[in-house]
Amino acid sequence: MSGGLAPSKSTVYVSNLPFSLTNNDLHRIFSKYGKVVKVTILKDKDSRKSKGVSFVLFLDKESAQNCVRGLNNKQLFGRAIKASIAKDNGRATEFIRRRNYTDKSRCYECGDTGHLSYACPKNMLGEREPPQKKEKKKRKRLVEEEEEEVVEEEESEDEGEDPALDSLSQAIAFQQARIDEEKNKYRHDPAEASTSEDSRRPRIKKSTYFSDEDELSD
């Protein structure tokens, strides 16, 4: 199973289809019954021409049942169409697996260049709008990739310390070391320490004239 799909219950087997109908034609025909996930036309191995048989995978079993009720034994381009719920042969997972067509320069239907299968001239019912769902998925993947890149950048920035903060811590440590050095110096030389302390204290000097008051000088 993939994406919650149940191909054994939501796949319609359609036969007696006009050989000229393309994959895109069938998409347009069956889309009236519900969301079509995939259309597979059985083709001759040698001629690559349609055998008039197709498997149509719907998004849900209700749409598949609506298709069977609405299309079985009905006339389509002058042919009586047979439609029934397909029997699971054990290859359901393989059937719904997404195929990637790397060569976008050629049409999947006719093999010519200059157009894609959605606009192939062999489409009896005209051009079909390319599915928008795939484009949304691509956009979503791009957004997710951008978010992952941002997360990676944020994580890389968290590794190690900020150089500015590192310089500040070094400056503080250097200043603290100088203070400690001065304190140790005063301990070893009390006279110098007292001299230094005296230099910070206000000095008392006597006035040039005799007085009982002392004069303070800076």
Swiss-Prot record:
<dbReference type="Pfam" id="PF00076">
    <property type="entry name" value="RRM_1"/>
</dbReference>
<dbReference type="InterPro" id="IPR034219">
    <property type="entry name" value="ZCRB1_RRM"/>
</dbReference>
<keyword id="KW-0175">Coiled coil</keyword>
<dbReference type="Pfam" id="PF00098">
    <property type="entry name" value="zf-CCHC"/>
</dbReference>
<dbReference type="InterPro" id="IPR003954">
    <property type="entry name" value="RRM_dom_euk"/>
</dbReference>
<dbReference type="InterPro" id="IPR035979">
    <property type="entry name" value="RBD_domain_sf"/>
</dbReference>
<feature type="domain" description="RRM">
    <location>
        <begin position="10"/>
        <end position="88"/>
    </location>
</feature>
<dbReference type="InterPro" id="IPR044598">
    <property type="entry name" value="ZCRB1"/>
</dbReference>
<feature type="compositionally biased region" description="Acidic residues">
    <location>
        <begin position="144"/>
        <end position="164"/>
    </location>
</feature>
<dbReference type="InterPro" id="IPR012677">
    <property type="entry name" value="Nucleotide-bd_a/b_plait_sf"/>
</dbReference>
<keyword id="KW-0694">RNA-binding</keyword>
<dbReference type="InterPro" id="IPR001878">
    <property type="entry name" value="Znf_CCHC"/>
</dbReference>
<dbReference type="GO" id="GO:0000398">
    <property type="term" value="P:mRNA splicing, via spliceosome"/>
</dbReference>
<keyword id="KW-0863">Zinc-finger</keyword>
<dbReference type="GO" id="GO:0005689">
    <property type="term" value="C:U12-type spliceosomal complex"/>
</dbReference>
<keyword id="KW-0862">Zinc</keyword>
<feature type="coiled-coil region">
    <location>
        <begin position="132"/>
        <end position="188"/>
    </location>
</feature>
<protein>
    <recommendedName>
        <fullName>Zinc finger CCHC-type and RNA-binding motif-containing protein 1</fullName>
    </recommendedName>
</protein>
<keyword id="KW-0508">mRNA splicing</keyword>
<keyword id="KW-0479">Metal-binding</keyword>
<dbReference type="GO" id="GO:0008270">
    <property type="term" value="F:zinc ion binding"/>
</dbReference>
<feature type="region of interest" description="Disordered">
    <location>
        <begin position="119"/>
        <end position="218"/>
    </location>
</feature>
<keyword id="KW-0507">mRNA processing</keyword>
<dbReference type="InterPro" id="IPR000504">
    <property type="entry name" value="RRM_dom"/>
</dbReference>
<comment type="subunit">
    <text>Component of the U11/U12 snRNPs that are part of the U12-type spliceosome.</text>
</comment>
<keyword id="KW-0539">Nucleus</keyword>
<feature type="zinc finger region" description="CCHC-type">
    <location>
        <begin position="105"/>
        <end position="122"/>
    </location>
</feature>
<feature type="compositionally biased region" description="Basic and acidic residues">
    <location>
        <begin position="178"/>
        <end position="201"/>
    </location>
</feature>
<dbReference type="InterPro" id="IPR036875">
    <property type="entry name" value="Znf_CCHC_sf"/>
</dbReference>
<dbReference type="GO" id="GO:0003723">
    <property type="term" value="F:RNA binding"/>
</dbReference>
<keyword id="KW-0747">Spliceosome</keyword>
